[in-house]
Amino acid sequence: SSRRNLELVETMREKQKKGSLLWVLDKTKTAMGARMLRSYIEQPLINKDDIIKRQDCIQELSDSLIDREELREYLNPVYDIERIMTKISCKTANPRDLIAFRNTLEMLPHIKRIIGNFHSEEFAACYDKLDDLADLYELINSAIVEEPPISVRDGGIIKEGYSKEADELRDAKIKGKEWLSELEIREKERTGIKTLKVKYNKVFGYYLEVTNSFKDKVPPEWVRKQTLTNAERYTTDELKHLEDVILGAEDKLYSLEYDLFSEVRERIASQVVRIQGTAKAVAMIDAYASLSVVATQNNYVRPKINDKGVIDIKNGRHPVVEKMISNDMFIANDTYLDNNSNRVAIITGPN
C-alpha cells in the first residue's frame, strides 16, 4: 500500500509509468538495466556502507562523462540476455535469437574495457564478474549464418565451413539445381516448347510445366502428373532421378542443420552460470549509468549519509513534481528533521 501511494513505479490512478519516480530515473539502455533499476527503487538500500558504495559508482560515472557516454553507446545494442537465456534453456531459441545474442556478446569486451577505468569497489567487483564470453561468441559466429531464418527445420542455418558433412550435402543440393536448369534448357531446345519451365511444389515435387498452346509438342515418353486450366504438368525418368538426388540431399541437410543448431544451443545453455553473472553485471552498470545521467541532467547533488537521526535538505526539489510542471514554476524547499524538537508525527486510524 505504501509503495502504491508513493507512486514509485506507476501512478495510482492511471497505472502508468509517466508521473512515477521510475519515469524520472529511468534512462537505461537495456531491458535488464530497466528491471534492475526498478528493483533498486522498490527495494532501497538501508545499510550505510552499501549506499555509499552505490554513490561512489554514480559519482565516478558523473565525473567521467566521456567514458559514461561511450559505455552507454555500447549498452544500447545489448539484447535482453536474461530473456534469451530462458529461451535457450527451454530449447525455444531460434537462429535469429542466437545472432542477436552474438551481437550482444560483441559489445561485452568494450563494456569491460571501460569499466576497467573505474576504481570504486562495486565496479571492481563488476569487472571481475563480467565475463566477455569470447568462446561463445566464436562458437555462434563460426556456426550460424549472418541472416538465418526463424525456423529451425527448413535449413539455411549453418555457415559454410562449420561442418564438412553439411558442406558436402549443400554442394549436392546446389549441383542438383544446376542439373535442373540444364535439363530445362536442353528440353526446350529438343522439343521447341518455348514456355517450358521446371517447377516444384511440396505435393507433386519437381515437374515440367507446359502451357496448353504447346501441348502438341510434348514427347510421348513424358508422363502426365497434373492437368490445370491453362497448362499440363509432366515428369520424366531423368527428372525423377534428379528429384531423388536433390530432395534426398535437402532432407539430410535440413536434418543435419537442425542437429548442429541444437548442439550449439545446448553448448550455450551449459554456460548458464557464466552468462547469468555477466547479465547481472551489465544490468547493474546500465542502472548506475542511468542514475548518473539523471543526476547530471537535473543537477542533483550527492547526499551525505549519517546515522545521527538528522535529515537536513537545502533547496530540496521533488523529482517528479519538478518534471510535471515548468521548472520556472517549481520552488525549492528546505527540510530539517531530527530526533529532538524538529519532528513530524503521522497519526492514522480507521477514520
Residue ranges and their predicted role:
Residues 1-350:
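Alpha-helical coupling/stalk and coiled-coil linker elements that connect catalytic or binding modules
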